[in-house]
Amino acid sequence: MLKRSAYTLTGLALLSSPVLATEEDSGSFWREEAMKTEFVKPEKVIASQKKRVVIDRITTVVRKELGEEWVASALKIAKVESGYQCHVTGPKTRHGRAKGVFQLIDSSARTLGFDPGKMYDCNENIAAGVAHMKVCIKYGVKDPRGMAACHVAGWNRWNVKLAKQHERYKQRYINMASA
């Protein structure tokens, strides 16, 4: 019932337009509009707004620190790692649990000069993730595939062939993050 009334109110406003009234058959117009309209739960709208804020923040910091050419790589890595969510914890590994948007482990955060306890703070994690990217560039990364490899394997091992299982994982990650 609510859907119909929303369509009706919107329809009345749109049909009052002389262009729409003369150019469109109202029945076909509304059938097409109904097919395009997607009703989204409020929680999803809030989640997408939060993601938009994170995406904008990553874009701003990467542009400032690394340049426009690295924005797409940073966004792909953040999407693969956390879906742009700030309070995400990765699975337990022999290196520890990765945290935040860029899924940094405590030792990486510490090495980069960041407090591991602040990795759930979105701004702090983004700054640490961008600092990691900066080190990767210093170690010779020149393209998105190299950046994905460096993010997953570390700046000392990004361009070497790893043990079979780790190499397979690295290659799958590179394909996801550079697609």
Task: Tell me what each language-model feature is.
Residues 26:
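Substrate-binding strand-loop-helix patch
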Residues 13-14, 18:
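Hydrophobic core
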